[in-house]
Amino acid sequence: MPAEKEKKKHKLIDIAVELQVSLDDIRSFVEELGYRTTNSTKVTDSVKELILDNYSDEKKKSDLHKKLKAEKNRKIQLLEKRVSPQADKFSKKKTAAKKEASQEKADAHAKLEPSIPEEAPAAIDIDDTPEVAPEIEIPSQNTQEPEPVEMDEVASAATLAVEEAPIAAAPTEEPMHNSEAELPESKIDSAEAVAEEAAPEVEVHLEPKEQEVQELNHAEEAETPTTEASSEETSAVMTKEGDSNDAQPFTQHEPVSRKTQNTTNVSEENKQHEKQPETLKSDKAMDVVQPVPIAEETAEQQLTEASSYEKKETNLQGENLETNEADAAQTEAKDDDAQSDSLQAEISRQQNEISNRFSQSENIAGLKVFGEIELHKKKRKRKKNFREQAKDLKQQMTPEQPKQEEKPVKKEKPKEREKPAAGKKEQTPGKKPVREDQKERVLQDGPARVIKKKPKKAVDEKVVDRNIRQTMMTMDDTNDSSARQKFRKIRKRERLREQEIEAAAKEAESKVLKITEFASTHELADMLGVTPKEVIQKCFKLGKFITINQRLDKETIELLSLEFNYEVHFISDVEATEIDDDPDLPEDMKTRPPVVTIMGHVDHGKTSLLDYIRNSNVVAGESGGITQHMGAYEVTLENKQRLTFLDTPGHEAFTAMRARGAQVTDVVILVVAADDNVMPQTVEAINHAKAAEVPIIVAINKIDKPDANPEKIRTQLADIGVLVEDWGGSVQCQEISAKKGTGVRDLIDKVLVEAELLELKANYSEDKLSRGVVIEAELDKGKGVIATILVQTGIINVGMPFVAGGSSGRIRAMLDERGNRLETVYPSQPVRILGFEELPQAGDLFSIMPSDREAREIAQRRQVIRREHEFRHSSRVKLNDIAKQVQEGQVQELRVIIKADTDGSIQALADGLMKVQTDEVKVEVIHRGVGQITETDVLLAAASDAIIIGFRVRPNVNAKKLAEKEEIDIRFYSVIYHVLEDIHDALEGMLSPELQEKVTATVEIRDIFRISKIGNVAGCHVLDGKINRDSRVRLLRDGIQIYEGVLDSLKRHKDDVKEVDSGYDCGLTLKNYDDIKVNDIVESFETVETKRKLVVS
């Protein structure tokens, strides 16, 4: 990876807004260049220039031109494929169609010549759904040249000519039209030629006068099907699109007077034609188009057939109609006869005109629209139903005499109805008598008519119910809409409130200054947004003198921030130099192996359990049989499932290691010996797991021992808040024997189940900057600094630059726990990395960096912050403090230099030594380091009067000779509790001894002798003990001490003696004191020094 890279300062989303191009298009273009992008990706100036060149206006025009040209060629090819096979078929059928045209014209004229007899009534096709009167809507003639018509359109138009009147015309396929890619003229001419051959034009000119239009509208009320020249019910809708794409429908309705077999056949053929593929539509259309102008039956036959059908219906309805209404029916029939006559005249005119049009041989294949007429638009009256049509027929065929008898009845009924029904709406004259007749017929005929009326009432009730439901639904919709409006208002107010809160939070956050402790004046000024001069002036006003590069303490930073109206939030060096990274993409996230930490008290079998799982013997390699290092191991099961295990020490001195293990793990296995109790380190491990919110699986070990009691362990765990599943809790528990392997496989299965529930995922993208944690670090003589890293996200390869705490470097090699070289490491995999410039601390974050320069900058900044922190917090001895300590003689200090094999061991030793010190004796670690003891360490110990503790390390040859010369005490240890014991004893020896007073003799004064030149001599008797000549004594009178001193002389008889035992008499004098009396007591005593014990609080 190059050391220098061009700075990325242009976001893709900003470039997309600038060019007015979709962000996805920009991303796809950049990815084609070989870059991996997201919505927040930044690019360099060179990449931005490439994007601008690609999406410039000239580039857009050229791309659009290419796209239009490709679309044009594609459509031309598609049209050629469609037209070529159809043209061959139509050319073959053209000759056959012309031959049949002459014969069909003759037949059509022969069948259309007979006119309708005057004496015959209008033919009526009685049907449940009466047909609409003949109506032809023709769109206005378009003078523009016809658009190219595809073969499918020709077939579709031909098919429309033979469909029944009430059936909608088959949809026509719009011609292929694209403003961007026009067809060449040669292709258009060929398409038009084929279309003209396949669909000859039929010219229809209808120009009815306004009076005729009104007659047609009036005829709709009593519409009756009439004879037709055609044998089919035809309905055609033709759409012609102009350049403006405006389409107007052309509809032709022709009433049908019969239902012939040809009509059924044509309808079936039309249905089949719609289901067939487009390639077969044109052939089917030609077959259907041919019989269009042929009329198989004459109008007279149609009328005869309609009359017979009419008589049958009339006989059925005549039985249920009242005879007393005949007169009213006759009056209404006169109006119907007039309307029928006008309707028949119009129909005859249209039939003659249509037959003339079909007489031309060129019109035999279809229709062509030349214009459109607009009929008089007004509200049409209601169509008569089947019963009303039957009533009209009966009135026409009923004799006149019954009609005259019933005339008075008709005159009286309207008068009776007008009074109660004055406020009601007026009904049609033909509909109301029928309803009255039905009501009266129900009363006269009884149940027979009631049966027919019930469905009518049920329909009415249904309509009412439907109207009620619609009204209720409308009301509900209104209520729902009002409720939705209220909800929208509430939601809007909530959004506004949230926006106000966010704005306030942002404003408050903008006034919070996040800074590290011991920042320089220049750095503080940059974060405050002011010049360093202003900061220095503020400090001058506050009475402090600082420089621009001076490091400021915590109090000064807080004071200056308040002066500039800022709040201060102090952060660590790692947070200050945190590296921003792109968010993880869902496609990059994959399931990762779980990380399992084994925790528990010392000697409960943690490492033995791991040895059984790994099929190794780690315990044999540990000094004293206890774990003193934090190990990371990867285990592969039989099903290729991978697990990562972290083995933590159980000794109380390794608290930091256990806390570190709980923070980076996914699952904790808590090992408790069944033959022991829940120990303090067990409780500590549980607290670490709870603090890290990590699930716990309890493993009760050593169940193979005779004195094992798993139930006692469960009880003790429940007392401290860990309730296992067997007792109704949520913590899994498994009884195992790490020595024999009993239950170990079940324990692993429970770990896998717990990991599956956690849904552990990590980013496996190679573009992701990897992250990890330093588990342990050591200094090897041949390899240099080696750190054990647990990868958390991303993929690590050899040669990548990195930073870990205050150390940086480039990966030179990667090793697994067995020393095998690795080229690539994935998430949740432990690895030993070589290439650190300095020794990192256990627990530091390991981060892959884009370049060596960035890694070095971050590492140097962290080192400055840490050095300043150590310097400011180092203990400084003042002269007054030294004088006070000398006067009191209480405080003793043991200076220590610690050298160990790993950084974790150093931390454990330092923490352990801090715990054994007291207020009178203290331990000061003046230097700590990883690696062997060097000459520098010896010189430092000689200058500071310190001892050197080597934990699993040895001095080099020169250091050993220098230590012997300077008489420096170097202690070597391999087990941590041996170090702590010796330091404990040394601190006890440094304690001042405890002084205790012991009474050696009690002497009673019985007589006093006065001797010249000597003074008063006391004659005494030794009551208890033995009084010595050198003993200190005190004189007690009535229990009150009046003198304390030494003896001046001690004699027995006349001889000087050194001591007098109990029960003997003696004489004594007190030095410089003569005020003695009879019965005074003299006590001799001595002070005894007692060695003190070091009591650690």
From Swiss-Prot:
Compositional bias annotation for Polar residues: 258-267, 340-363
One Pfam family in the UniProt entry: IF-2
Location of region: G2: 625-629
Main location: cytoplasm
Region (Disordered): 79-458
GO CC annotations, alphabetized: cytoplasm
InterPro entries listed in its UniProt record: EF-G-like_DII, IF2_II, IF2_N, P-loop_NTPase, Small_GTP-bd, T_Tr_GTP-bd_dom, TF_IF2_bacterial-like, TIF_IF2
GO molecular function terms attached to this record: GTP binding; GTPase activity; translation initiation factor activity
Chain intervals with Basic and acidic residues compositional bias: 97-112, 174-190, 202-221, 268-286, 402-443
CDD domains listed in its UniProt record: IF2_eIF5B, IF2_mtIF2_II, mtIF2_IVc
Subcellular location: Cytoplasm
Keywords: Cytoplasm, GTP-binding, Initiation factor, Nucleotide-binding, Protein biosynthesis
Regions of compositional bias (Low complexity) in chain numbering: 157-173, 224-236
Bias type Basic residues, positions: 376-385
Residues reported to bind GTP: 600-607, 647-651, 701-704
Superkingdom field: Bacteria
Region (G4): 701-704
Region (G3): 647-650
Domain tr-type G: 591-761
Keyword presence, Nucleotide-binding: yes
Family indicated by similarity: Belongs to the TRAFAC class translation factor GTPase superfamily. Classic translation factor GTPase family. IF-2 subfamily.
Functional description taken from the UniProt entry: One of the essential components for the initiation of protein synthesis. Protects formylmethionyl-tRNA from spontaneous hydrolysis and promotes its binding to the 30S ribosomal subunits. Also involved in the hydrolysis of GTP during the formation of the 70S ribosomal complex.
Protein name, UniProt field: Translation initiation factor IF-2
Organismal lineage: Bacteria, Pseudomonadati, Chlorobiota, Chlorobiia, Chlorobiales
Gene name tied to this protein: infB
